[in-house]
């Protein structure tokens, strides 16, 4: 490993496994990030955009009805209320300010559910940067409202037809573009994964989620929660929630992976629970892979969790036992999606529904246990209504 300013590893996970040509680019990004973090003018501009453009701080909402019949108090951290509809907007604003600071004139990004693409498109529109969004052709189909939003805001959406036509293929295509155009282009990675320094940058630009949550829950309840719960694909919303609680050892950190059609079917996206460490997307982290090391197709009903690997800090937190990573199936997530809508009047993203489903399981398995839980409601479900409507109609669920 060449010298870096910040530690590129979390235990054994992380690193900079990229073509030689990109090492200086990553180091330039790291240097710009470290300098920006110490520059009051950068911080002021970032915080101003978060407050007056994105709408921070987001609310902490108590569920009045969902946990009736149990002694659990369940709060939702409302990242779904952020401009753009998900937590993605937080770190996108930070990274675009960084790109401008480095003199880059073009932004590229990958997206699965389309939420990161939308966040990138809206920030590029506002800050006057052209952008190209790489998206698996399959995801372009299942997330059509977000594709229209991106195009409406001036982004070029590039459907990727290679491989499984999903997020992992979009990531590879974006990385190729970056290697060819790094002099004028910033690759705005959408999650806390990829080569160093991306996992650290994304965490630092998302950690206000947990900071706000801690202050809000102490004000409302006078104590810390027993657990904070977030869904995990690449892991940015979860690391944003976890970071301020890592040293609070009384608080369980629960990251929920997608079990898809059931772990036993092989159709899932749970590399922490069922993968093996390997090199992928510029980092060392658990990956879903075959016996001979080929990357397996991940699967989840939610495009944003349909990823065969995970951010290296989550791999580290899992390896030291500080965080736990259970999984939730498509069907459990769909049920939670429906329950939150029907009992609280909030339509969650299918991604966030995985975290909600696990919280409801915790409440209902121990109805007499007094628990204070916080779920990071990482995004809203507008993008998923057509997918869910089709399934509910077929199954007679509504």
Curated annotation (Swiss-Prot):
One of its GO terms (molecular function) is tryptophan synthase activity. Pathway: Amino-acid biosynthesis; L-tryptophan biosynthesis; L-tryptophan from chorismate: step 5/5. The keyword Amino-acid biosynthesis applies. The keyword Lyase applies. It comes from the Bacteria. Its EC number is 4.2.1.20. The modification N6-(pyridoxal phosphate)lysine is found at residue 88. PANTHER family: TRYPTOPHAN SYNTHASE, TRYPTOPHAN SYNTHASE-RELATED. Tetramer of two alpha and two beta chains. This is Tryptophan synthase beta chain. It comes from Mannheimia succiniciproducens (strain KCTC 0769BP / MBEL55E). The lineage of its organism: Bacteria, Pseudomonadati, Pseudomonadota, Gammaproteobacteria, Pasteurellales.
